[in-house]
Amino acid sequence: CPRILMKCKLDTDCFPTCTCRPSGFCG
């Protein structure tokens, strides 16, 4: 998972292999 701060609501908002954390950011 790329170490880039991205806001998200769903895993699909993130890069592949990243998940949407409860914090509202991809990780």
Swiss-Prot record:
Disulfide bonds join 1-18, 8-20, 14-26. Pfam families: Squash. SUPFAM superfamilies: Plant inhibitors of proteinases and amylases (SSF57027). Keywords: Disulfide bond, Knottin, Protease inhibitor, Secreted, Serine protease inhibitor. The keyword Cytoplasm does not apply. One of its GO terms (cellular component) is extracellular region. The record marks 3-4 as: Reactive bond. GO terms for molecular function: serine-type endopeptidase inhibitor activity. It is found in: Secreted. Its main location: secreted. InterPro entries: Prot_inh_squash (IPR000737), Proteinase_amylase_inhib_sf (IPR011052). The presence of a 'disulfide through disulfide knot' structurally defines this protein as a knottin. Belongs to the protease inhibitor I7 (squash-type serine protease inhibitor) family. Inhibits trypsin. This is Trypsin inhibitor 5. It comes from Sechium edule.
